[in-house]
Amino acid sequence: MSKTLYSFDFDDTLCHTPDHIEGKKQWEKITGLSWPYNGWWGKAETLDSDVFSVQKNEWVYQRYLDAVADEDAYLIMATGRLKKIVGMRENIDKILNQHNLSFDEVHLNWGGDTFIFKTRLFEEMIEKTGCEHFVMYDDRHEHLIKFEEWASEHHVDVTIVDVIKKEETKYKNI
């Protein structure tokens, strides 16, 4: 049983991945081709390390190292990137490996709304690990607000870390 379950989001939390505006410019510059799709986040090519140099978020990385040093910890990465997209998992794994980021489990969205995916996953992981404390790192403001509501409904202590503001909110639960 792990006392603390840590969850790290991927895009703009662990790593500074390209957004659709700068990413499309970079794609065209490196490949000489126009971006061939309408969407961005659902495409494995957005994480192609031959095109993009994805850097880790140093502030989050320091917290990741603290979590790794916690002997009673279980670490997961949870991303809204879709599992069913060919090449997505491989590209994410390549970026994680480039930055020596290792997790007990890596989870990609099985489909649908990212917030719903993550809350269901977190509930499963809290049950699986039997943790006393759940710590999550994320960057999406609209999700963080909903995660705060979600946190108050659980029997474990929850810490939500807003990696943009570099603030954490703790919820003591019984």
List the predicted regions and their residue ranges:
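C-terminal cap/substrate-recognition subdomain and adjoining C-terminal extension
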Residues: 2-5, 71-74, 81-174
